[in-house]
Amino acid sequence: MDKDLAFLTRCSNEELGFLFDILTKKGSLSEFITTSPEYKKYGKDYRQYVELLAAEVQDFGSNTFWFRKDYHTVAKAACKKSGASCNSSDSTEEIESKMLAHMMGKAWEKLSEKDKNVFIDNCGYCGGDVCTFLVKKGASKFFDYLLRDGATASYQTSLIIANAVTRQTLNRGISFAANTLSKPLVVSTLAGTTAAGLTLGRLASVFAGPVGWALTAGLTVLDIAGPAYRVTVPAVAYIGCLRNIKKYQGKR
């Protein structure tokens, strides 16, 4: 298995199930998982054939451009196709983070001034750290910091994005995020305190529409290059979220 996807062996069947559905439902014309002996034997016990899921991500090829040797290359191409900038020297985690932050940044741009103010006011930092950071650095940088926080903020933000990706791609959210989405948002990178009055559920509701719009717009454009992008972009985004989730859980 590709070293950058080895962490998938630590994921639950529920977590892997969403990746399976992205690969098989969005790539229904060219996926090979559902015809494999492993799938026929184990069905929804995805942990039994996680290597097959990883290989499908790497080799997914509705057009020959997408036959890649390693996940880093696939992630880099998906990142650039999403509109985010990355370099070959970036680690896989950095590439995923830049892609996810870009998605959230584009969502922020589409928010009304009212919704932006709701976000800032609920954070309790208007005139403080978050407000100043957003003005000086921009939304993409802000969410990049949250994703790289390595603590609760990264975990919670990743759950929000994963929930948005699966809702947009599969028309259903991630059930394993339900409890966390009701807890207060912790922005430890910037202030080290709990954002007063802001829950992930409220924040998710603010970003659900714009993030969905960003993904829809991106996937519409990607149709021009070939249907493989409709799979690899949400797959890489979801994998990036899973990586942050497992990293956080591993520290507890």
Over which residues does each language-model region extend?
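Extended aliphatic helical segments
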Residues: 33, 50, 57, 74, ...
